[in-house]
């Protein structure tokens, strides 16, 4: 693994001019290196090429500093497009999409595709990255929001142990 000095020297090559002084980095790295940083990225960011590339650059910087990042991403705009292609009209209750089995299949596909794009871009930036399909990894225990919404629920329990195992595999 690279030394901190090597990492800082490498960062100088792409550190933004308008960012805080690069000499300030070590104190923040020390503070957050042992933490799990969770970044929520909305689906709109992922369909805007400029925002998406900036997002990937920011994650790559954190990775190269040794700060573990967990990305939680949305997919609303792409889900909407994919549903429209199949002539599936969405209905909402209080902002939540009513999700039947057919809709859920489209949602899962769209999110897996986004996940793959994020991983591919991060690997091109020499970052270790892996996807996590929560429906296949039993990371969450969920309870149904209400029957009218179908496959919409709230997390009841999150398996930190499984998440930590995945993070450890990335080191």
Would you name each region that the model predicts?
Residues 1-171:
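Nucleotide/pyrophosphate-binding catalytic subdomain
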